[in-house]
Structures are given as C-alpha cells and as structure tokens.
C-alpha cells in the first residue's frame, strides 16, 4: 500500500502538520474526544478531518485484543490510557493491512509498545526511546513482584505503595 501515520493527542497538540508529509493520516475517536476539550485545537482537527487530511477510524476488536495482550505482557497497562491502546491497535491493524505504519507520539510508553508491535514511531518534542523495556510492578517494602498491576497501587501483602521498574531492556525492534 503506502505510508500511514497514526496521530496521538500529543502530536495534534504540538501542531503536527498533515500537509507536510506524503502519507495517509489517521487518528482514533478517543483522541478526537480528548482534543475536543480545547477550542482552537478542536477547530484545527475538525478542519483537517473535513478536508480529508486526517481520517478518524476505530480498530477492529481483533487488533484491540492483541494490542491489550502485548500491553499487559510489557507491563505498560498502568501507563497507557484507553486512547493510547486504541491508537496502537489501529496502528497494528493498518500494518496488518499492508501499510508502512508510523505512530507519532511523545509518550514513551506508546513508543515502547509500538516498537514491540513492529510499528515505526516518531516524537515531535522528544527524541524518542532508545531501548525497549518490559516493566514489572514491585513492592519496595516486602520486595515482592506482581505479574498484574494491582488496582489500588498498594501491596496486598504489606500495604506499601507499589512502584514500577524495568525488568528487561533490549534494543529496539527494527
């Protein structure tokens, strides 16, 4: 196919110009909802959508499920919003449809998961990640680690606030 660029809220807030890049541009409904809280940016986004420069598209459930699985395996579930997960799922779907897909986001967790999904990524205000991380949740009090994030962020054993740390670092997938 061609090139597809998936835009995160941060890209739209930073003023990413869709007319400067030869590619199809996409975003997801939840990003559009986040932008609609700001009048000026809402107007710019609506103009880009109405003029055909940006397409708003929801990912298929198959890609949502696969992306949620990867997010969980990487320990990024607490760091990513529903909009982030939806955006990454759309990127995975576009890649599956044959597009050369790049996610534009300054969020390091989005970039981390995009790398694992085999998507390109680019930041506007940041250089982007240099290595890929898998995260684990741990208790600094009793030193236990947890596979799944605890809902309240508190250790069920000793009551200490839980923290995240990298459990594995590796070079980026290319």
Language-model segments: what does each one mean?
Residues 2-95, 99-100, 108, 116, ...:
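Active-site-proximal, substrate-binding regions of enzyme catalytic domains
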Residues 166-174:
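Long, charge-rich boundary regions
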Residues 138-142, 155-158:
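Short cysteine-rich clusters marking metal-coordination/redox-active sites
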Residues 158-167:
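Short Cys/His-rich micro-motifs in 6-15 aa windows
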Residues 147-154:
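Short linker/helix segments within small regulatory modules
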Residues 132-135, 151:
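Short metal-coordination and nucleic-acid-contact micro-motifs, chiefly zinc-binding Cys/His arrays
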Residues 24-31, 119-131:
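Short hydrophobic/aromatic-enriched beta-strand-loop microsegments
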Residues 101-103, 121:
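Hydrophobic beta-strand scaffold residues
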